[in-house]
Curated annotation (Swiss-Prot):
Pathway: Protein modification; protein glycosylation
Location of the protein in the cell: Endoplasmic reticulum membrane
Intervals, Lumenal compartment: 32-501
Name under which the protein is recorded: GDP-fucose protein O-fucosyltransferase 4
Enzyme Commission no: 2.4.1.221
Family: Belongs to the glycosyltransferase 10 family.
Organism: Takifugu rubripes
Keywords: Disulfide bond, Endoplasmic reticulum, Glycoprotein, Glycosyltransferase, Membrane, Signal-anchor, Transferase, Transmembrane, Transmembrane helix
Chief localisation class: endoplasmic reticulum
Glycosylation sites: 173, 428, 478
Function: Protein O-fucosyltransferase that specifically catalyzes O-fucosylation of serine or threonine residues in EMI domains of target proteins. Attaches fucose through an O-glycosidic linkage. O-fucosylation of EMI domain-containing proteins may be required for facilitating protein folding and secretion.
InterPro entries per the UniProt record, alphabetical: Alpha-1_3-FUT_met (IPR017176), Glyco_tran_10_C (IPR055270), Glyco_tran_10_N (IPR031481), Glyco_trans_10 (IPR001503), GT10-like_C_sf (IPR038577)
Gene name tied to this protein: fut11
Length: 501
């Protein structure tokens, strides 16, 4: 971790004359705000130190802003009166063309923008971050008291382990993650619909048995993303000792993929020829790249869609979302790869037992009430033009939450004895927290010191905690330069070594 500090630039001290000029400029700018807009007495030190431009958007820009018509509402305020939501990851901004748009949500309206010029503007109520892109050493500092932070992270926990630690996740006030406990859950993001589970008709078992007699393995492994936190290849390699596995991807490859087929195992699309090819297998090894409650991807849902049985490792609570009580084979329910192989061979030789895993394909055989209710109630859609996507959905969630918070703050200021101030929301570990990566097979203390997985993922996990605590320290000390992160991490390490908290 300390090696990462090498080569970092240091802040250039301001000369006295320049500092005096800046202070005068800030004083004049503050003085230009009406009392009700700035309210210095109600602001903490971090906001007093920040220059608050009246607007980064000109009058002409306000007038020409487009409008995303969501559910619609009775909010008739002008664009200049609306709170602003700043998308910090511009590449995820869910509107085009342009970088600013009015959004009309279920209960209220906001301006959404990816224009970072508005970061310090008083009306910028919330900053929305994409978890994969969030870096402690690039955070928008100083953090202003009047702004909330919102996190959108639907991808693997491996993309940013900072979010799996308490000091990291509690930086955010609103969350949209794969965890059901998040404010705007994306748990079933890879399941388009109930119909997706029911179709197509599986390859007949008689055909699968014929292919087995001709040499097709009972188990398919299709992975081209190797060396991941879940260490799945280590487990599959051990499993291969006890049962035949056809592996077509780059990981543990033992069979070439036909030239007319494209490996779409890591893609979001579903090429039909490839899907038909893999549907011939009885079992699909479906091991996620990261292990975390409710983290379930296409690796789980595609085999179910195709009428194959997923042999699954990923979410520890995956059974909560399965179509019925017997839809998938959970790897962690078996004491060893050998025991799992024996069970798969048993199913391979017993058609009646195997068919029980595909009963959900029949009408009215999907009995999981939680799954059915979640699909029915979610407001966003997957490849469904009749519903908003989850980016627009979360954006509107934040917009409505912020308008409610701001209204409650105004009511409290007008009648503090009658109206309580709004409660400050803060995310916790249940919104994202994922466990320390562990070996796919065996115990960590049995691994050689030069093991590539050991040298990578456990270290990444704990270094991410250092960065989360470092950013928390930057915010606590009202720092405005995020590159000071490494200095704060070093100072905390020194304090710990001296036995100080």
């Amino acid at each position: 971790m300390l090696l990462q500090m090498a080569g970092r630039g240091k802040m250039v001290p301001c000369v006295c004359l320049g500092l005096l000029g800046v202070l005068c400029w800030v004083w004049v700018s503050f003085a230009s705000f009406p009392d009700e807009q700035l309210s210095l007495g109600a602001m903490d030190a971090v906001e007093r130190a920040a220059f608050q431009p009246q607007s980064a958007l000109s009058e002409m820009e306000f007038a020409s802003i487009g409008s995303y018509r969501g559910p619609g509402n009775l909010d008739h305020r002008s664009n200049k009166e609306l709170p602003i939501l700043l998308w910090w990851s511009a590449g995820l901004f869910p509107h085009f063309p342009g970088d600013t748009e009015r959004i009309d949500c279920a209960r209220s309206s906001c301006l959404a923008t990816s224009n970072r010029k508005v970061q310090l503007y008083k009306r910028t109520a919330s900053i929305i971050f994409y978890g994969t892109d969030f870096r402690a050493y690039e955070a928008p500092l100083p953090r202003l008291r009047h702004q909330t932070w919102a996190l959108f992270h639907e991808e693997s926990p491996m993309n940013n382990y900072l979010l799996s630690h308490g000091p990291g996740i509690r930086l955010f006030n609103y969350t949209a993650t794969f965890r059901r406990e998040s404010d705007y859950p994306l748990t079933l993001q890879w399941l388009p619909s109930l119909e997706y589970l029911l179709t197509p008709v599986p390859v007949p078992l008689e055909e699968k048995n014929r292919l087995r007699r001709e040499g097709l393995a009972p188990v398919l492994y299709m992975q081209s993303h190797c060396d991941v936190p879940s260490d799945r290849d280590r487990y599959v390699q051990e499993l291969m000792k006890y049962i035949q596995v056809d592996s077509y991807g780059k990981c543990l490859n033992n069979k070439p993929l036909a030239g007319n087929l494209e490996d779409t195992s890591t893609a979001t699309g579903e090429e039909q020829t490839f899907m038909s090819f893999v549907a011939r297998y009885k079992f699909h090894l479906a091991l996620e790249n990261g292990l975390c409650p409710d983290y379930m991807t296409e690796k789980l849902w595609r085999p179910l869609h195709q009428g194959c049985v997923p042999v699954y490792r990923g979410s520890s609570v995956v059974a909560d979302w399965m179509p019925n009580e017997r839809s998938a084979i959970i790897i962690d329910e078996f004491p060893s790869p050998q025991a799992l192989a024996e069970y798969l061979l048993h199913l391979d030789e017993n058609d009646d037992e195997y068919r029980k895993y595909l009963e959900f394909k029949s009408p009215k055989r999907i009995t999981n009430a939680r799954l059915l209710e979640a699909l029915e109630r979610r407001e966003w859609g997957v490849n469904d033009m009749s519903k908003p996507n989850y980016l627009n959905g979360f954006e509107c969630y934040v917009c409505d939450q912020e308008n409610a918070r701001l209204a409650a703050e105004r009511a409290h200021r007008k009648a503090p004895k009658t109206n309580k101030p709004p409660e400050w929301k803060m995310a916790n570990n249940s919104h994202m927290g994922c466990p320390l990566p562990s070996p796919g097979y065996g115990q960590v203390h049995h691994l050689p010191a030069d093991d590539g997985w050991l040298q990578t993922w456990p270290q990444d996990y704990w270094q991410s905690l250092d960065q989360a605590e470092g950013l928390e320290s930057l915010i606590r000390h009202n720092e405005s330069d995020p590159s000071l992160l490494w200095k704060h991490i070093q100072n905390m390490a020194v304090r710990r070594a001296r036995g100080k908290n």
